[in-house]
């Protein structure tokens, strides 16, 4: 067993809450998508409020349907990219496992990314169904996974901004 400093937990124990959060995000994302797939037809719109609708669409590209019009290679490209990014974020989560904000951010991104990877593998595209609009202007439809990824990136940025405020400022360099 590796030597642990006083008050330090084993890596798996320290990462467990964040891994559970990632799994919960992925599970909730997939549950909501299964409900939508079971109850809606492709392209069907269910108005909820004057600015929010449920609409079932399939996104073969990335954010904002980037590369969606291509022949299908992007399915495997975005799947591979998500797997690589999740691996990198797991390594960062391990590195920052005793913190709170960064591992939570990484967990949200990982859970969302895996949720969308599952879609690409099962459906060949990501299932989107949340649509916000104002009059004729609308935001592209998205899903819970996309929301978790966005929230995770926002938390990462916030953590970095907070960390920058706590660093002592370096004085001017003096020539030797």
UniProtKB/Swiss-Prot annotation:
Reactions catalysed: Release of signal peptides from bacterial membrane prolipoproteins. Hydrolyzes -Xaa-Yaa-Zaa-|-(S,diacylglyceryl)Cys-, in which Xaa is hydrophobic (preferably Leu), and Yaa (Ala or Ser) and Zaa (Gly or Ala) have small, neutral side chains
Pfam families the UniProt entry points to: Peptidase_A8
Subcellular location as annotated: Cell inner membrane
GO biological process: proteolysis
Pathway(s) of this molecule: Protein modification; lipoprotein biosynthesis (signal peptide cleavage)
Record keywords, A-Z: Aspartyl protease, Cell inner membrane, Cell membrane, Hydrolase, Membrane, Protease, Transmembrane, Transmembrane helix
Membrane topology according to the record: Multi-pass membrane protein
EC number: 3.4.23.36
Catalytic residues identified in the record: 128, 146
HAMAP family: LspA
Record function comment: This protein specifically catalyzes the removal of signal peptides from prolipoproteins.
Stated family: Belongs to the peptidase A8 family.
NCBIfam families hit by this protein: lspA (TIGR00077)
UniProt name for this protein: Lipoprotein signal peptidase
Annotated source species: Azoarcus sp. (strain BH72)
């Amino acid at each position: 067993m590796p030597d642990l400093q006083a008050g330090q937990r084993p890596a798996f124990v320290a990462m467990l809450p964040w891994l559970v959060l990632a799994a919960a995000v992925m599970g909730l994302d997939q549950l909501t998508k299964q409900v939508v797939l079971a109850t809606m037809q492709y392209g069907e719109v269910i108005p909820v409020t004057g600015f929010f609708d449920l609409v079932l669409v399939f996104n073969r590209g990335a954010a904002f349907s980037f590369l969606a019009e291509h022949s299908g290679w992007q399915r495997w490209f975005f799947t591979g990219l998500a797997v690589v990014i999740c691996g990198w974020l797991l390594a960062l989560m391990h590195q920052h496992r005793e913190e709170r904000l960064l591992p939570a951010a990484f967990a949200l991104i990982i859970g969302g990314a895996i949720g969308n990877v599952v879609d690409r593998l099962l459906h060949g595209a990501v299932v989107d169904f949340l649509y916000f609009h104002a009059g004729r202007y609308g935001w592209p439809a998205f899903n819970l996974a996309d929301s978790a990824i966005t929230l995770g990136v926002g938390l990462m940025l916030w953590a970095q901004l907070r960390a920058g405020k706590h660093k002592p400022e370096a004085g001017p360099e003096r020539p030797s």
